[in-house]
Amino acid sequence: MVLVLVVGCQSGASPDRPDESGQSSPLNQAAGSIPNLPLKRLDGSAFASGSLNRDSATVLFLLSPECPLCLDYAYTFRTLAEEYQARGIRFVGLFPGTYFSELQIKKYCSRFRLEFPMVLDPDYALTRALGANTTPEALLLNEQGQLVYQGGIDNWAYEVGQKRLEPTEHYLRDALQAFENGQKPPLARTKPVGCLIE
């Protein structure tokens, strides 16, 4: 199963290029490196983050119901999840911080019919462990919790407030297709454009 996590609004290096900041995710390490944190799903049930180290690949989206790009990309989140969950890849939304209420998150998910599990990270514990700092941001993890891809969903938004008519590069989809074919993604890391996680 694959987990995609989305968070995040910032502008930085062009997402058309690999992230050349020199910063590496804490997940660029051994399998099973995600700590087992006791978190809660939006529906109130328990979520142990250590489950991301096993069973299936996961796409993890870091999200915020107040970030304009999380609103703009909601349809893309849904279509990717519908397509790839049917092929055995798990999708999870992660909401870091407490700047918004659970009611706001529920309204966001209901409005855009996002039906994959949503996890709350009020203390940023999992967000920090993932090395994520933007919403929306996507991570693709293999079945052992190792990072396959991290960054933007595509290059539709190339700066905050600036979008192409249509994306010309589909970073996350390309990474998913490569993963399914047993290959490395064309880009393992891109610079996400969106809202800074605070």
What are these regions (language model features)?
Residues 71-112, 120-129:
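Structural microenvironment flanking redox-active thiols in thiol-disulfide oxidoreductases
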Residues 5-8:
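C-terminal motif of bacterial Sec signal peptides marking the signal peptidase cleavage site
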